[in-house]
Structure formats: C-alpha cells, structure tokens
Amino acid sequence: MSESPVTNASTLPGEGQMQFGIFSVSDITTDPTTGHTPSEAERIRDIVTIAKHAEEVGLDVFAIGEHHNAPFFSSSPTTTLAYIGAQTEKLILSTATTLITTNDPVKIAEDYSMLQHLTNGRVDLVMGRGNTGPVYPWFGQDIRQGLPLAIENYALLRQLWDEDVVDWEGKFRGPLQGFTSTPRPLDGVSPFVWHGSIRTPEIAEQAAYYGDGFFANNIFWPKEHYQRLIQLYRQRFAHYGHGTPEQAIVGLGGQAFMAKNSQDAVTAFRPYFDNAPVYGHGPSMEDFTEMTPLTVGSPQQVIDRYAAMRDHYGDYQRQLFLMDHAGLPLKTVLEQLDLLGGEVVPVLRKELAKNRPAEVPDAPTHAARVKAVYGDGPTRQARPNAAGGNNLTVGGPYQDTPAAAPKAGSAFGAAATR
C-alpha cells in the first residue's frame, strides 16, 4: 500500500474532550397518538428550535441528515446549519450524512468552507452514500457505481481543500484545469470529516487511509456488527501511520426515550415505536431495545447503557442521540433534551472521562486542529491576487502560498478510480 496522507485528526489534549449531541434524520411522521402530520414548514421551524435548545441544555453538537425525497425535509443541510449557526454561539454544527456520491465535490468544498467562515469554525461533516437508492438517477448517477463514486469524489474534495489550484480528471465528472474553490477553508484548515457507514468495510478503510474520523450510525444493528467495522477502522488507521488504534477518532449514534419512571417511558414511546416506518414494523420494542442501542426507560438506564459503550468499542470521541423522530411532538422532544442535557450527559461526561488513557485524543475541534498546524503563530488569511481567477497564465490565485498538499496514494486517491 502506498503512502497515505497526513492525518486529518487532532491529537492535542485538552481541546475538545468528548462531545455529546443529537442528530436528526429530518423525517416527517404522523403522530400516532393524535393523528397529526406536521407540515414541512412546521418541521423546519421545529428543527431550528430543537437545535437551539440543544445548546441551551449544554449539548455540544447538532447534526442533520440529507434527503431528497418525502417524507424528509432536509435537502439542504448547509442552509439549515447556517441559519442555526447565526442563532447559536458554541454549538458544533454537523451533518448526519452529506451525500458524497450525488453531490458535486466542488459544491461540497465551497459550501462547507463558506459555512466554516459563517460559524467561525463550528462545523464538521459526516460523509456517506445515503440509504435511498433512487437518489442516484435523480442526480444523474448509477447506484451500481456507488462505492467508486464515493472514493473518487472524496479524493477530489480533499484536493480542492488542500490545494489552491487544482488540475483534475476522473471518471464521474468533467475535468478541472487551474480551478480554485472559494472561499478557501477558514484559517487554512478544512472542516473535520467523519465517514459514516452502516455496513461497508471499504468506507471504514477510506476513513482510516485519510486519518479522518469514523462515525458508526449504531441505531439499527447489533453491537457485534459495529464492533467489526470499528475494529477494522482502528487497525487500518494505525496501519496507515496516523497513530495507534486507540488514537483513531470514533463517533457513535444512539437512540433514547426517557421518563423519570421507566415504565412511563415504555408506555409513552410504544405507540411511536409500533407505528413509525423507521422501525419497519418488525421486532417488538423489547426485542429491538435488546438488539440495538435504543434505550427506553429512566435517565439512569440510559446512563448505564451508554457508559458501557466504550467496553464494546473502546474510548471514543463523539456520542450523538436520535431524539426527534417517529412523529414525536416538539414539546416531547424538548422535554427529552432537558433530560438528556440535564441528567444524562453530565454523568456520562464524568463516567467516560474516568480512566481514559492520556494518549486517547479529545474530540476534534477547529481550534485544536488550527493549533496542530500553526501552533501559536498566525493562521492563513487567504487574500486573492488581482488576476481575476486566471490561474493558467498568471501565478497563484492568492498572495500567500499554502503548505504543500498531502500526497494521495493509490488506494483511495485519484489513481484508484482511473
């Protein structure tokens, strides 16, 4: 295997610690207890309220998915996150999935760099292929090429962020000659990237190759399935020279529904579980909670369940919870966030910090990653030359020269798809 790029992760201690938050798949589902189906406008307003409340109760991260079909509303995550970013101060804004297969890498590079600037660096993203098959032809792609698309598009995205002037030719989009994506990443440091996977080992391999994070969705499958993916990612992260397996950057999804009394939680959530399409009308709620991380009960039960996650997966950096799905009304979701932020997360922070080895990196933040590149020195402030975008006959497009871009290898670089 050829040389891999330098790591995208920060291993500086004391900058990010462990992050807790929520993610939304943006479903619009009928409330089975009232028969009310929210309008798109209602759900969009509600998701902003939910994200703002997440910050108010002390959570670190809000993430939203990307879908281009009903019954989902989140077709433009960057628009939503920019609006939320303008109304929050500390909340890290992320995606549950950014579709690397059907979005143009040029647009991803520019949109998320812009979001970085608007939020002062409070942004990262989870790359994924999505789980809606028809989205491929809707955007002119072939689902049978899903994995090669993901590999080629991400290699181009990294090049667009790492290099001011890009010459590129691949299989799935037109060539680029002397192209510069704008704006350049904030402080000369691109957004941190997680690679999300439910079942694909090649995505874990890709995350490891680049030294990026690996986010295991962890909501619909047994722990043994994700243990295999995470173990593979950790081993390959070390293989590519980014650190030890324990220094790999891992995020987990999860689900919870709580009440002070556990039986009250079971009674209240059962109609939502039994009727929500997301659960597929398959196993009983009891069987599903046994097989997956879904925890329906008291806050202490949620604490106990998630404090044990590192026993299964090792020390990790980010824990997100799915809280606003299955038709739950806004009032209930906000009450769930009160319990999550007020009773669960403070205890989990302490429990998961206990006996955490010093070499285990904290969760990545923009500030930590900037410090890893520049130390205490000045950061890059990209100032264009007067060439008007002519990168072919005039020198570089900017007054300064960025550091040399990481060298792509043959496994997941552009050469892999030619």
Region locations from a protein language model:
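N-terminal beta1-alpha1-beta2 module of alpha/beta enzyme domains
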Residues: 1-93, 190-191, 374, 390-418
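Internal, glycine-rich beta/alpha segment that forms the wall or movable "lid"
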Residues: 2-17, 33, 104-212, 224-227, ...
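Conserved, mostly hydrophobic/aromatic
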Residues: 20, 54, 58, 66, ...
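Active-site mouth loops of central-metabolism enzymes
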Residues: 29-45, 97-106, 188-199, 290-300
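Glycine-rich, proline-tolerant flexible connector loops at the mouths of alpha/beta enzymes
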Residues: 61-84, 99, 131, 218-221, ...
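Alpha-helix-loop-beta-strand connector modules within alpha/beta enzyme cores
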Residues: 71-97, 149-153, 338-349
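Aromatic-lined glycan-binding groove of carbohydrate-active enzymes
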Residues: 202-208, 226-234, 241-279
